[in-house]
């Protein structure tokens, strides 16, 4: 009996490592080995095993390169290099890079060929029933969001060969049907209760010539429409759901296939909307689902992508405007379809998940395509923060968050991050007192003055000035030196809204030690006399600091008496900032 260690890097991910779970089952039930699973380095006290005969390290995201390499290096501290096996998605996509960095040649692709791991029968690992019990090894410190679900494949491969997608490398051969009955039976037999939901990880299930057989098996397994699950703890009934998690291909969704899908407990139906050029096909697919009462829909909206080919088409690089059009289309489409439904009918909802493209060989998340820039990509992230990356079909939310039209949307993308967050409509909170709501409303009104001031300056830029301004901000790096890239007064004022507090302090220090009369006069006049609120971030910073030794007080010469008075009024009597101000006799 060998001691086997399974390692997953300590990045956050939604789904458990299916490959390691299958390897665990192979070692436990075929080779009768002892297996332990750890997410990140082994935590003290969780296992009494001190020596290992083999260590497996999985890799998932290419942009988690650093953590994956660190995990492999950690494995080297436990066993000799010839006892380490590296595999998974990232190392399959970048085998040469992983070998160069670690000295270990990864095992690539699926474990469906003999000899990949050096054991008799290792060609069966991909089809083996996953061992869910290994998740108990990490239960004290990590839980995957979707643990109460079966993770299965009813097909393998895709066949569409989209340029941005890894499936053609990971699963090059299309397999149209894999029965999951026996796997679910074995999982249930090893558990105290069945699992509630079913996540099918198929990359293109609609391509299968056995699609009807797949649907019939799902119904037989208890996942027909309106299927019920009895919670083993509460004994209360809950609805079961099927999620074809990797999405359904709009090009392959026919009325007949939608009719079959409507017979199972699918929620949501995920339909990819990878490019605006797929608009007609996508809209047709949504309408087809709606006709068959598949009412909870979602879509992956790829953005920041370069030109690519796939599905028999060639696609141009997408633009920021394309993203808005696709998101707005979903809002309008849901409104239109729901307006045609009777009051008693269930309405449809369409949730969009914008997904930023990262090249398959990228070791970091920071890729910027030709039609995008760093500022716009960050702005999209900021807009999506309140909804954790999801865009629903609420028209009021969408038009508030993304703008009433493309022009307003493009202006929002140019906004400083904190001003993007200050936008929105005021809503009274019933659970709060009148005084608390009054204070919230006063703050809201004040925030809108800041937003309005920025918009006023921005809208006063001519086309030439706007181009100059955007050339400065689109790199999304805001230092004091930016204002010296222009002599335009409006642009100089606008740039003050972008500077971090640390850079504002450096700017005032620079004014104190250099001759830059034009810029100094514009900044001082604007901050001290025209719009002191532009310095509110600096004010809040100064009120919170514990030590004044990290910066000079040159700013007091340039911020205006109103700013100094606010500091005096709001600072605690014993605060460092107040002591310093008094020492300066201000």
Put a short name on every predicted segment.
Residues 6, 183-305:
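Conserved SAM/AdoMet-binding glycine-rich loop
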Residues 54-56, 83-85, 198, 265-270, ...:
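Conserved C-terminal portion of the radical SAM core fold
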Residues 1-3, 32-34, 148, 161, ...:
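Residues that mark the start of a beta-strand
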Residues 97-117, 258-268, 325-408:
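Structural recognition of alpha->loop->beta junctions
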């Amino acid at each position: 009996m060998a001691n086997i260690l399974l390692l997953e890097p300590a990045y956050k991910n939604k789904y458990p490592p299916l490959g390691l779970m299958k390897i665990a089952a192979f070692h436990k039930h075929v080779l009768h080995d002892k297996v332990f699973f750890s997410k990140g380095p082994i935590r003290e006290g969780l296992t009494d095993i001190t020596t290992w005969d083999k260590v497996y390290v999985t890799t998932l995201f290419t942009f988690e390169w650093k953590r994956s390499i660190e995990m492999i290096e950690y494995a080297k501290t436990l066993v000799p290099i010839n006892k380490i096996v590296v595999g998974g998605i990232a190392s399959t996509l970048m085998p040469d890079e992983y070998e160069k960095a670690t000295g270990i040649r990864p095992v690539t692709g699926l474990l469906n060929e003999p000899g990949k791991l050096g054991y008799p029968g290792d060609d069966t690992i991909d089809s083996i029933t996953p061992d869910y019990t290994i998740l108990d090894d990490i239960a004290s410190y990590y839980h995957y969001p979707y643990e109460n679900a079966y993770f299965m494949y009813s097909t393998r491969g895709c066949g569409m060969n989209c340029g941005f997608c890894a499936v053609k490398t990971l699963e090059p051969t299309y397999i149209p049907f894999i029965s999951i009955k026996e796997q679910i039976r074995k999982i249930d037999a090893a558990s105290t209760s069945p699992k509630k939901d079913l996540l099918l990880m198929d990359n293109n299930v609609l391509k299968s010539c056995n699609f009807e057989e797949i649907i019939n098996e799902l119904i037989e397994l208890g996942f027909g429409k309106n299927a019920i699950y009895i919670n083993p703890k509460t004994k209360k009934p809950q609805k079961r759901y099927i999620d074809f998690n990797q999405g359904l291909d709009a090009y392959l969704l026919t009325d007949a296939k939608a009719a079959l899908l409507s017979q199972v407990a699918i929620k949501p139906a995920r339909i990819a909307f990878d490019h605006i050029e797929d608009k007609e096909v996508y809209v047709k697919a949504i309408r087809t689902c709606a006709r068959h009462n598949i009412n909870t829909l979602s879509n992956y909206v790829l953005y920041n992508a370069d030109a690519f080919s796939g599905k028999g088409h060639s696609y141009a690089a997408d633009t920021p405007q394309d993203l808005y059009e696709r998101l707005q289309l979903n809002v309008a489409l849901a409104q239109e379809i729901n307006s045609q439904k009777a009051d008693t009918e269930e309405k449809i909802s369409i949730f969009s998940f914008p997904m930023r493209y990262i090249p398959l060989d990228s070791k970091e998340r920071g890729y910027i395509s030709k039609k995008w820039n760093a500022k716009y990509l960050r702005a999209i992230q900021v807009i999506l923060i309140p909804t954790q990356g999801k865009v629903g079909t609420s028209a009021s939310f969408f038009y508030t968050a993304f703008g009433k039209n493309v022009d307003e949307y493009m202006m929002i993308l140019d906004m400083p991050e904190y001003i993007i967050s200050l936008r929105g409509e005021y809503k009274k909170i019933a659970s709060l007192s009148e005084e608390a709501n009054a204070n919230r409303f006063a703050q809201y009104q004040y925030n809108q003055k800041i937003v309005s001031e920025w918009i006023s300056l921005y809208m006063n830029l001519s086309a030439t000035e706007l181009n100059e301004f955007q050339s400065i901000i689109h790199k999304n790096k805001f230092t004091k030196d930016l204002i010296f890239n222009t002599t335009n007064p409006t642009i100089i004022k606008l740039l003050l809204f972008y500077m971090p507090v640390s850079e504002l302090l450096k700017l005032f220090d620079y004014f104190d030690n250099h001759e830059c009369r034009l810029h100094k006069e514009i900044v001082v006049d604007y901050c001290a006399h025209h719009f002191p609120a532009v310095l509110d971030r600096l004010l809040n910073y100064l009120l919170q600091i514990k030590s004044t030794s990290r910066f000079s007080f040159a700013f007091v010469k340039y911020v205006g008496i109103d700013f100094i008075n606010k500091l005096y009024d709001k600072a605690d009597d014993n605060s460092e900032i107040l002591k310093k101000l008094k020492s300066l006799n201000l």
